[in-house]
Structure formats: C-alpha cells, structure tokens
Amino acid sequence: ILASKRGSQNVGIRIVENSIPSNFEPLRTFGWASISLIVKNLDEIITKINSSPFKMLCPIRTMNFNQGRIKLLDIIGIGSEVISLVEVLDANETNLPVPQCSIDRPFMVTLATRDIETTKNFYYNKLSIDKSPEVQSEIWPLSDAFQYNRDTTYALSKNLFGEKTFLELHEYPEDSTRRNLISGNLHPGICHITITLPKIDDLTLYWLTEPIQIESGAFKNCKQVTFFGATGELVELIEHKTEN
C-alpha cells in the first residue's frame, strides 16, 4: 500500500500485480475510471512525468471545483490506470485537503456509470453517501477516448465520501462497454476501492462471499467483504473501529 511520505496517511493506493487484456481501453468502459491526487505544483511535476513511464492524456487545464478553481493534469500509468493530478488555485478553498508534500494523498475516486441517478441512489441507500446535484461539464480525456469534440459535456456529480474525500460519478456515453478481465485476475486499471466502516453486518448488501478475517497487514483480524455496485464496480468493505 502506497501512502504519502510526508503528507496524510489516511488514504492510500494499493498496488496489485495483474494481467491486462490487450484490447483494454480504460476510458471507454464502465467501472472505476480514475483516482485524483492533491499536489502542490503541477508545473514542477510535469518535468518528472516527462522522464517517467507515465504518459500525459491531455494538456494541463483549469476548471471549477466546488466553490474554487483547480489546475488539472490527467496521466496514465503502466497498468493502464488513469490518475488526475490536481493543484488548488484558490487559497480559500476549504473543501479539498491541503498538500503537505509535492504529491500528496488521493482525495477523489471517479466511477464511470451507465445511469448517474441510479448509481447515486444505490450508494445513498446502501452506504448512506449523500447525493449531490448533477452538473454538465467537459471531460477532455473522455471525449478524446471516444473521439468526440472536447467541448462535449457529460453529466457528473461530486458526492462527499468522507472527510475531504469525494466520490465523483460520470455518466458515460451509450457506446461504453463492460470492463473485461482475464480469468483469475482482477479488472484492469483501477480495479476496486476499499472503504472502512464500523460495522459490516448493519448493511443490506449482497456479498460476493461470506465475510472473512484479514490475516495480516494494517487491518489484521478485521472482517472483510466485497460486493458489486450499481454498474458492476467492485467494492471492498473492511470493518474497522477507529480508536479515539
């Protein structure tokens, strides 16, 4: 599990070795589409990206986020994972975490969905994630993937997931497809997300398997289950009681 060295340790990224179908197109399929990391200075980071295995999907651009403005760069990694690097431009924007190092923690995960209203209702009813209004917005990497004009707009909503952490929903075009996988492997790209919560048994969800107990790592002896969401996305839940 990767976490920020000098920044927040509350949210991290788990790296899993996986086989990827040769025809996988990460931005043309339903499921977990990308993660967003909060950063300090995008212009400085670009020089490092240019000499790394990561590839830029679109030029840097500025856009609105909540009540402020952000600078955004989308990149793709060697596992076909899409990552958005976000620099906050407004000093008075308080809804996003403040980066404590050059590249800090994930603060948002994006889900590509068939129907945004159905997905919002699912996460509200099952995990009590509050619903937020939909807006129409340009999403350049998505338009590029489908060879649409970049001024094409899509329905999206940003839903508060936790403290300064968001679940963003994108309603994808009709010609999007299910995300295929190689038998015995996880879905390629961003394969799933993990959520910790105090009590799993209180939820009305259909588990893929019976709950198991984690045998090692940071959540040793904690209960764990997985389920599929409204668009077939994989979600892992870990029962973990935070100590005061």
Task: Please annotate each region the language model reported.
Residues 11-14, 36-37, 43-102, 111, ...:
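Vicinal oxygen chelate
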Residues 174, 184-195:
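Low-complexity, glycine/alanine/valine/leucine- and proline-rich hydrophobic stretches
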Residues 17-21, 33:
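Conserved donor-binding loop and adjoining core beta-sheet/short helix segment
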